[in-house]
Amino acid sequence: MSNESNIITVPILGKDTVRVGFGIHQYICTEILENFKSSTYVVITDSNIAPLYLEKIESTFNKSIKDAKAEARLLTYVIPPGESSKCRAMKAEIEDWLLTQSCTRDTILIAMGGGVIGDLVGYVAASFMRGIRFIQMPTTLLAMVDSSIGGKTGIDTPLGKNLVGAFWQPLRVYVDMVFLHTLPPRQVINGLSEIIKTAAMWNENDFQLLENNSAVLLDALNKPSVPGEYKFDSIKPLLQKIILSSIRTKCEVVTLDEHEGGLRNLLNFGHSIGHAYEAILYPQILHGECVAIGMVKEAELARYLGILKPNAVGRLTKCLVSYNLPISVNDPKVKKYASFKHCPVEKLIEYMAVDKKNQGSKKRIVILKAIGETYEKHATVVSDDDIRFILSRDVKVDEFTKSSWDVVVTPPGSKSISNRALVLAAMGNGTCRLTNMLHSDDTQFMMSALESLGAATFSWEDGGETLVVKGNGGKLAVPKEELYLGNAGTAARFLTGIAALVSSKDGAKVVLTGNHRMKVRPIGPLVDALRANGCEINYLEKQGSLPLDLSSKNGLKGGIIELAATVSSQYVSSILMCAPYASQPVTLKLVGGKPISQLYIDMTIAMMASFGVNVTKSTTEENTYNIPCGKYQNPPHYEIESDASSATYPLAIAAITGTKCTVPNIGSASLQGDARFACDVLRPMGCTVEQTATSTTVQGPPKGTLKPLESIDMETMTDAFLTASVVAAVACNVSEGDPVTRITGIANQRVKECNRIAAMVHELAKFGVRTGELEDGIYIFGKNYKELKKPEEGIYTYDDHRIAMSFSVLSLICPSRTLIIDKACVEKTWPYWWDVLHQSFGVKLTGATSVASDPLKGSISKNASIILIGMRGAGKTTIGKIIAKQLNFKFLDLDELLEDYLEMPIAEVIFRMGWDAFRLEEHKVLRKFITEHPEGYVAASGGGVIEMDESRNLLSNFVKEGGIVLHVHRNLEHIKSYLSEDQTRPTYKDQESIDDVYKRRHVWYRECRSHYFISPVLSNQVIDEKIQYSMSRFLDVVTGSSQVLQKFKTKKRSTFLTLNYPRIEDALPTLRDVTVGCDAIEVRVDYLKDPKSSNGISSLDFVAEQISLLRCSTTLPIIFTIRTISQGGLFPNDKEEEAKELMLSAMRYGCDFVDVELGWSSETINILYQHKGYTKLIMSWHDLSGTWSWARPHEWMQKVELASSYADVIKLVGMANNLNDNLELEEFRTRITNSMDIPLILFNMGRFGQLSRILNKFMTPVTHPLLPSKAAPGQLTVKQLNEARVLIGEILPEKFFLFGKPIKHSRSPILHSTAYELLGLPHTYEAFETDTVDEVQKVLNLPDFGGANVTIPYKLSVMKFMDELSDEARFFGAVNTIIPIRIGDKLVLRGDNTDWRGIYDTFANALDGVSLRDTNGLVIGAGGTSRAAIYSLHRLGVSRIYLLNRTLANSYRVQDVFPPDYNIHIIDSDNIPSEELSSVTLSAVVSTIPADIELPEKVASVIKALLANKADGGVFLDMAYKPLHTPLMAVASDLEWKCCNGLEALVRQGLASFHLWTGMTAPFDAVYQKVIE
């Protein structure tokens, strides 16, 4: 424990306010009582800190009071933890409590806690009784060095953090570092971020201290706690020094600028952008972590503006990473904790607008000039455009318009040389200083991994210009965590060799992993070579790629090592560099053909010699190298040559723009093959090239005069082929022949960061450039640059730095601005490439976020192709054709493609070649389909396509890239029955039964599928006729076409019915009745009872069948809910894994909503969010205890904070103990809805809670008397809800009218009155017959006017009263429905036309989901109704519409009304040939002629002839309904048409108007029956 002599005092504002020490509880209590007399001391803390420290503080303080014989008392108050407590309500609660305790102006408040407690209690002190004294006792590192110092106090508001508060200095700040002992490691690191920030902007020496001691600090931090020991004992002096350095800086700045006049702004380095990220990512990502991201972004901004050197950004980034702090939103830590959150750029800029540093609308950011120094002594004004560029994922590149330009560009250090130098220096003895090091993602991954392996320590000198590597002589250890390498292929290959040298004990293994692209890049030949030499290496996922685990008892054995080197020279370099540390000298034999990129092998050997190891090439054996045992001896200094591959980009800019560029440090003496690019590629294309041993200058020819290269072998500079390709794209200056450039020798580029050859072909095509692949290269037809097309969807970069930089070059000559997606990928080799374009070349760059890169758009690509998998006989072909028809895609059967390719049927293929060979050919066809048809196709695959690992990987990667793999299935017994009748298919391999095959494949289908469709089954029969309808609903959700949630948001009120049946089949007889007035159906999965389940939990297939059956039985959206026992349901609380699989499956089933309880683990919730696709998540919580208060809503706010990270909808349900609980809930609803966009479902359960259900307007759960039971206590029916809302004035009675004459016999009044009665609405509907249209105006102005229908003769004349018209009203030139829209005091009358809806809805109901796309339709008659009929058929997808009328002239008049794409064909009944009549097959017919009109004989005969040619499922609608069954209906019925009468269309048209007025759907059957009566 500390005594007073061990306590360090730091002055601030002229007072010795800050006291720092270890274990100073006793000192604190004594010092307060001695120096700050009071009658009342109040310790305020939170419920996290209280159990750890409050009792000890109380007892020590009370003992001190007793010892001092002071007349004082100590009070304590504990509040809920978290940011939600930092609010007005909590401030008021504390103040009220203080008053009840008779606290007076001499009271001293002691804030014991983190930043929330300190800010809140400080603000209470600043305002209580106009200001009382307070003391800060911070318990987190973040609060110790930041929030507790300087007197800033405040609370949050709905519009932002800390917007209300005061400057109020504490009497003391007691920094007791003993609190850090119980602080979780992540929270300590959170505070270290602020310490790094302070050093980065104020003191380079402090920054160096942090740089050099990260490993020491983290080792102590991660050391397990031992009872009775202080975790940081071993580093007390270091820890104290670091904390004090930050405290002193802040105290110094605050003393100079207490009230934030300018200088104090500097303490906000990293905060302007960091706070914007925090507004979205908190609480999953902590304040310090967000500030770390903000620091990097603000440093990048300073670099972009030309103020901060690139190495300083790299140095800052390296320091942050060394403390396990995130440096971007793509950082693994952010992905781990908040992968479900997205940070839209415009939202970030919007948050940045609310910043106290800003000057009005001008944003001010702290700009670094160097590590430890800022650009100005206050925050600097920065434009939104520059901020937007830094924050944006993508970039728009403008055309380069300068006619002359002469620039010198120095590329960063070579990635190849940097990575090799890092390995050699780390493995060597002694210290080596590396200069011109590349600061990039790749080298950052390499350095971090080498440190984790214990290979070396790194530090910086010369302001970050020099990297000091202290090698450990090849001594390595198994790291504590896996080594994450992103997409750094060079690091992955080199480190695989290094990791093979690690001697592991007790089964410890080195694990190398990376991002999803790294996990498909090849490393197999290197692994094979190392395995053959005794290393134990396992693939953890895909064979031949990372992740790997490696273990070896004695490291590399040595001797002869054979390696295939035709794919990557990096395999060779990896073994070369680790070979000196093998147990025996190594003889490395390169086998399998000519090694690729020989110059890079030579580079490695030359560099090894510089570090003291000489490799000799055999003179007797080809491609064989001898490497002696030894250790690298580090040279004192090693300068890294600039990257020759990167140098090609500025030189290429000169070439295509006709300007001049010099690269001063790459010349003919370079070790790098790409240094030849200017001489071997650009000079033959027409450029003037000057190259010395150390520099290269290119002067481009006049714009547009570059020459193509007939053929060039780029095997010695393969990476530069991308640059050559974009230059060749505009090389069209030829005297004869085609302007084609052929590049060869680059086959290895297919297995780089991406398949670069295929990528170049694909992306150049977007510019309109004709290209194609060669066996080992590419050909490009040059194009006049003025004719380049704009890539409409942007250039996709494949996470490949060289793709991005190459296309940025071509963008400069494109006449229109070019979007390049994922600009950050250049950080791999040239992190500041965009800065060079902006500063050196003067190119205008604009930040952008494309649809293609916007994660909010869902994981499924627009128009993504769909691959169907599933058992033989599951219906893949049938369903595939249905999908293709509904989406207007093309359909392919992959089995048929295979048969065409091999020119024999499948059965013969298997008979001749065998099953294994057949599977390989099947795999090839699948791969070809995925490559050639990524969009716009539906493919049915063979049932066993998932049998091969390679095919399963193809399917899985297809899903990752945004494709859809749909598993199609039907009841297995039906499949067996179907296949027993089909003798054309080959028997299964080894005569397996269908049951055995499905049992084996079932897991694979689940592994590969992104979605799942199971055919609906009712009474053990597949309902084939319902598949089209069910599929249509399914596709709406999985392709993102559904707008259900958006529709709910725009409705005044919405409800959903809860189904709690054991089987959906039991609900079907009453389904229409019970869902009257509902907007959605909730399936309570916990109520379902699977008869085959042994544990009471329904199987995935059983639930899938239930969902499928429900989907084909209703038009309503489906909510999938599993309610646990603890939340008021039936599902076991301890079956989380089963619940997770069911909810994931619900997303694959295409359910509209999935209810996710907030009680599930964060891991489960994260997984659900990541896989939700277009399914919407309802995040829910039910307080069954009734103890949570809406008036003191801290628990509820914590749930809101958690839910808002994931939710599309938040559902919070309490338990009402009295009516007042509902009123408190409404106050909570009002507060929360003002501050968030996510819709809320809020209500209380129980008898007393029914009022809250009535007041809840969004998605209120309802019940129905016909259901077996209520799903929750207090549920009401739709009718009860509406009736109650009428009584409380929530729904006001309105009057509706029918305008026209004559209308006395209209059925509309009975239609609408019935609907109102059934739904409990108080409205009336009456016929308003009038002689003139002007008389209706007085009705339109009635205060209770709810709407009107309009019939003849006023459909046109009433339009003069309308303020706006719907598209349909404009199209028809008539209004039949008037909708009043009240916006405040203003009344807007909207005219609509629903005549067509009666026809459309009648057909939609009769078709039951069957599509009319690409079918023929017929309209009989050419009066006014015929227009609505034609319009409806076109909307239904009918591609050709025949029009038949007795008067031909009227038919042509109707045809002239419609655009040509309606494809209307007039039938002349007098002249139509009989063969034409017989060739027309109809699917839909509408008769619009009165039933009592006798048709001419020829017209009648033509109608009968046409009706005789009916397609399957044809629907006939006669708009006449007097009589109900007309003569034409009789003819159609005899010909087996599905007939509908005009009264049905009339009712459906009326209900369409009803829906427009009320937002509710009325029950058709009950209304129709009443109208008939």
Swiss-Prot record:
Residues binding 7-phospho-2-dehydro-3-deoxy-D-arabino-heptonate, per UniProt: 130, 146, 152, 162, 194-197, 250, 264-268, 271, 287, 356
Residues that coordinate or bind NAD(+): 46-48, 83-86, 114-116, 119, 139-140, 161, 179-182, 190
Pathway: Metabolic intermediate biosynthesis; chorismate biosynthesis; chorismate from D-erythrose 4-phosphate and phosphoenolpyruvate: step 2/7; Metabolic intermediate biosynthesis; chorismate biosynthesis; chorismate from D-erythrose 4-phosphate and phosphoenolpyruvate: step 3/7; Metabolic intermediate biosynthesis; chorismate biosynthesis; chorismate from D-erythrose 4-phosphate and phosphoenolpyruvate: step 4/7; Metabolic intermediate biosynthesis; chorismate biosynthesis; chorismate from D-erythrose 4-phosphate and phosphoenolpyruvate: step 5/7
Signal peptide range: none
Domain of life: Eukaryota
Cofactors named for this entry: Zn(2+)
Region EPSP synthase, residue ranges: 397-843
Keyword Metal-binding: yes
Binding-site residues for ATP, renumbered to this chain: G870, M871, R872, G873, A874, G875, K876, T877
CDD domains linked to this entry: DHQase_I, DHQS, EPSP_synthase, NAD_bind_Shikimate_DH, SK
HAMAP family from the UniProt entry: EPSP_synth (MF_00210), Pentafunct_AroM (MF_03143), Shikimate_kinase (MF_00109)
Pfam family membership, one: SKI
Active site: E260, H275, C825, H1182, K1211
Gene Ontology MF annotations: 3-dehydroquinate dehydratase activity; 3-dehydroquinate synthase activity; 3-phosphoshikimate 1-carboxyvinyltransferase activity; ATP binding; metal ion binding; shikimate 3-dehydrogenase (NADP+) activity; shikimate kinase activity
Protein name: Pentafunctional AROM polypeptide
Family of the protein in this entry: In the N-terminal section; belongs to the sugar phosphate cyclases superfamily. Dehydroquinate synthase family. In the 2nd section; belongs to the EPSP synthase family.
Annotated residues for binding of Zn(2+): E194, H271, H287
Keywords from the UniProt entry: Amino-acid biosynthesis, Aromatic amino acid biosynthesis, ATP-binding, Cytoplasm, Kinase, Lyase, Metal-binding, Multifunctional enzyme, NADP, Nucleotide-binding, Oxidoreductase, Transferase, Zinc
Region spans: 3-dehydroquinase: 1059-1280
Oligomer and partners: Homodimer.
Any one GO cellular component localisation term in the record: cytosol
Classification via InterPro entries: Aldolase_TIM, Aminoacid_DH-like_N_sf, DHQ_synth_AroB, DHQS/DOIS_N, DHQS_C, DHquinase_I, Enolpyruvate_Tfrase_dom, Enolpyruvate_Tfrase_sf
